[in-house]
């Protein structure tokens, strides 16, 4: 049985007097695919901002890999990332330069960075683009770098 990597329970958020989302419940299993769909103003961005800890919920709980995001945000955020449709990349960098930069600003120990970069590139299918400038990759491969 696969673990729940993200679990949302009774999630609600209120902007002053209006509820943006109310009593949202869902779970995403490890290696799962999940679509958050809805019309404009349905609360998709609010929900994602709460899951990414950009916004604090009014009610309910978010668990990342079993860790309560509200109670232990630093530990929980180690297990999640968010990639917007248009990734904010430094396109003048090579893939390796960018991945090193990202690991460095996340304060990963320098001796662990090269191995982590290789794992990430292999997992995303971009190993053969290591020395290529990001601007010279297709949109799909740029998303993988992000």
Describe each model-derived feature in a short phrase.
Residues 3-6, 13-146:
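ABC transporter nucleotide-binding domains
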């Amino acid at each position: 049985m696969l673990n729940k990597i993200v679990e949302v329970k009774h999630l609600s958020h209120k902007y002053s007097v209006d509820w943006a989302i109310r009593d949202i419940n869902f779970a995403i299993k490890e290696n799962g695919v999940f679509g958050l769909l809805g019309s404009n103003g349905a609360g998709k961005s609010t929900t994602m901002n709460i899951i990414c800890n950009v916004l604090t919920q009014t009610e309910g709980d978010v668990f990342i890999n079993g860790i309560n995001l509200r109670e232990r945000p630093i530990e929980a955020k180690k297990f999640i990332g968010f990639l917007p449709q248009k990734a904010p990349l430094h396109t003048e960098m090579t893939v390796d330069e960018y991945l090193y930069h990202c690991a460095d600003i996340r304060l990963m120990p320098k001796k662990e960075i090269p191995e982590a970069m290789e794992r990430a590139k292999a997992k995303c299918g971009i190993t053969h683009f290591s020395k290529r400038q990001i601007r010279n990759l297709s949109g799909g491969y740029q998303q993988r770098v992000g």
